[in-house]
Regions:
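Extracytoplasmic/secretory-pathway proteins
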Residues: 1-238
Length: 238
């Protein structure tokens, strides 16, 4: 039944008070936020067109506006982060409850940073009209500040801040971050982001001028050269 999803957030909310630890409550609250995010993303075109006062939130989630979803997500993530800060646990403790990639723990080792990551990812789906996106930049700064400069965790958050910044191409910013951290544990991640960014612009557009074409080719060549230089300089690091 498609309507079942609208009942799931309140169902999960009912388990929050029954949880035995703040860490469990934090993860359940974040899961509740995830459900609201999923509802919004499945039909965002519809919710984006709803014009309604921010508060009170309608009992019927199907009648919410995009701004109301953003408000609710921000509220839930704020509470989840408060709980996680009081009882931060390794994310690996929840390996049976949360799906994550093999390298995730290198960058997001604990539940606080995981919840912060999900906050940034889900609230980034809202445009500036519905959510102040400068708050995403602030959240990334918070994430980076939790870890040692140049560490994989700190570089991850700095790259996330770059990725969520206005604009579509951030190659130069990733490259500058990499160069500023050469020799530090997080440098490979920044380099990988620069490479991924440049892969997307390998081929000059059909209507590109000669100067634009040469600039794109030069960036491509610099991308190919960077890993070779890095491996040559730090052979045991990569």
């Amino acid at each position: 039944n498609p309507d079942t999803i609208f009942t799931l957030p309140s169902l999960v909310n009912g388990y929050v008070a029954k949880a035995k630890t703040d860490a469990d409550r934090a993860m359940l609250t974040a899961f509740e936020a995830e459900l609201y995010a999923s509802i919004y993303q499945d039909n965002m075109w519809r919710y984006n067109r709803v014009d309604a006062p921010l508060l009170p939130l309608p009992d019927d989630i199907a009648k919410w506006s995009a701004a109301q979803f953003a408000y609710k997500l921000n509220e839930l993530y704020t509470e989840a982060l408060r709980l996680a800060k009081a009882d931060n646990k390794p994310l690996a403790d929840y390996k049976n409850d949360v799906e994550y990639g093999k390298e995730t723990l290198d960058y997001i080792p604990d539940i606080y940073s995981f919840i912060l990551y999900r906050k940034v990812e889900n609230l980034s789906e809202f445009n500036e009209k519905f959510y102040d996106r400068t708050k995403l930049q602030t959240a990334c700064d918070e994430g980076a500040a939790m870890y040692a400069a140049g560490s994989p965790e700190a570089i991850y958050w700095q790259c996330t801040k770059i990725r969520r910044a206005p604009g579509y191409r951030h190659y130069d910013e990733y490259l500058d971050l990499y160069k500023a951290n050469i020799g530090k544990p997080g440098a490979p991640y920044a380099l990988a982001q620069a490479m991924n960014e440049n892969y997307e612009s390998f081929e000059p557009e059909a209507n590109a001028t000669a100067d634009e074409r040469n600039e794109q080719i030069a960036k491509r060549d610099s991308m190919i050269a960077l890993p070779k230089q890095a491996i040559a300089k730090y052979p045991t690091f990569y």
